[in-house]
Amino acid sequence: MAIPWVEKYRPKTFEEIVNQEEAKYTLASWICAKFKAPREFCTRWAKKKDKEIVEAKAVLLAGPPGIGKTTIVHALAREIKYELIELNASDVRTGERIKQVVGRGLREASLFGYEGKLVLFDEVDGLHVKEDLGGLETIVEIIEIAKVPVIMTANNPYDPKFRPLRDIALVINLKRLSEDDVVEVLRRICANEGAKCEEEALRSIAKSSLGDLRAAINDLQMYLSSGKKILTVDDIKRVGERNPQLSMFEILDRVYRARWFDEARAISFNPSFDWEQYFLWALETIPTVYKDLELMAIAYDRLSKADMFLGRIKKTQEWELLPYALELSLGGISQVKNKPRLPPFIKYGFPQRLLLLAKSKEARRRREALVEYLAQNLHVSKSFVKSELIYVLSAIAKKDHSIIDRLSKALGINALDIKNLLL
Ligand SMILES: Nc1ncnc2c1ncn2[C@@H]1O[C@H](COP(=O)(O)OP(=O)(O)OP(=O)(O)O)[C@@H](O)[C@H]1O
């Protein structure tokens, strides 16, 4: 597989990072004031002497996706010859784990040729503070005692829960890149790839990227895939036309009728593809398409494997597993051995599960309100009400209907609601 251009063209030096001069000056001034760094680098970049910069304990780089936050730290480490110890939100879910990784990184001797170590907590706003057993506190603790530079990045660190990080670190805001900045980088890449790219085409890519250079570079690579050496504005329009909004019926039809694995897999690139919805539809349409039990079993087996990946993603936020789930649920159910010729028209039914959820929405809402009311008034958790109390009350109510009225009076809730819930 071709190397992604976002990696191939990731700037290696401070100089190559486009239009983030202020951020580069501030970051370099902080590093040069507090840590060992090459003289030439400091002379070129460390232009600021503000107290708040030179005394900061750590740095938090903030700004929208794809504008160079991670890149600037990688380039800095290379410029000052520091070894990078990098953690992202999925590594740093628990305080314990953070301490393990950072501690091990700091204890081990640096590889030959490095002057020191630099800790990067990438995308700290990906931390779900409540569930993150101590993640945030541990980062603050590490910053307090660290003798090495600690840098964090975040798309949106302004949520009140990240206040401890903002308080302890110097926040450096990176700018959203302009359309011209993005076009400039794309033009350089075209030249380097030996491709002739129309200015208008590059502008159109830049416009839809909304300043996210990563997205723009990825789009350019897609347009110039399979060795194409010319990019015109018509190519861009054509791809837009090739990717119309599809209904779920059309998506399913394309998946089941795909002739190759890749053809089915590629449907996930359509802008209207919603994998969670698709999954529900796939679950119920397999028997409509495959009448043969053996084929049905194969398709369900693949879908169940995809479901295992999805379960794991939901639990651990390991989003890098999503491609496996998609391959199994698209290519996997489309390409079964000895697939029969499909009839020209297949009637895909609306998933019963969605219908049921829609029908029972009101009942579920009432039940939820009642559970909440019971939990609050009886000073127990909602899960206790759902998992235990309701069964006890229901068993009593089956023998003695008067409990419904008594509960209704005591709690001030309609007797019918209580009856529906318990019986
Ligand atoms: N200012 C920039 N100058 C040059 N290239 C850039 C710049 N910003 C981003 N890029 C390109 O975009 C890619 C993604 O950048 P980077 O990973 O640094 O984004 P980010 O701001 O950290 O985004 P996220 O918050 O999504 O991680 C880089 O590999 C690089 O190719």
From Swiss-Prot:
<dbReference type="InterPro" id="IPR027417">
    <property type="entry name" value="P-loop_NTPase"/>
</dbReference>
<comment type="subunit">
    <text>Heteromultimer composed of small subunits (RfcS) and large subunits (RfcL).</text>
</comment>
<dbReference type="Pfam" id="PF21960">
    <property type="entry name" value="RCF1-5-like_lid"/>
</dbReference>
<dbReference type="InterPro" id="IPR047854">
    <property type="entry name" value="RFC_lid"/>
</dbReference>
<dbReference type="GO" id="GO:0003689">
    <property type="term" value="F:DNA clamp loader activity"/>
</dbReference>
<dbReference type="InterPro" id="IPR023935">
    <property type="entry name" value="Rep_factor-C_lsu"/>
</dbReference>
<dbReference type="GO" id="GO:0016887">
    <property type="term" value="F:ATP hydrolysis activity"/>
</dbReference>
<comment type="similarity">
    <text>Belongs to the activator 1 small subunits family. RfcL subfamily.</text>
</comment>
<feature type="binding site">
    <location>
        <begin position="63"/>
        <end position="70"/>
    </location>
    <ligand>
        <name>ATP</name>
    </ligand>
</feature>
<dbReference type="Pfam" id="PF00004">
    <property type="entry name" value="AAA"/>
</dbReference>
<dbReference type="InterPro" id="IPR003959">
    <property type="entry name" value="ATPase_AAA_core"/>
</dbReference>
<keyword id="KW-0067">ATP-binding</keyword>
<dbReference type="GO" id="GO:0005524">
    <property type="term" value="F:ATP binding"/>
</dbReference>
<comment type="function">
    <text>Part of the RFC clamp loader complex which loads the PCNA sliding clamp onto DNA.</text>
</comment>
<dbReference type="InterPro" id="IPR003593">
    <property type="entry name" value="AAA+_ATPase"/>
</dbReference>
<keyword id="KW-0547">Nucleotide-binding</keyword>
<protein>
    <recommendedName>
        <fullName>Replication factor C large subunit</fullName>
    </recommendedName>
</protein>
<dbReference type="GO" id="GO:0006260">
    <property type="term" value="P:DNA replication"/>
</dbReference>
<keyword id="KW-0235">DNA replication</keyword>
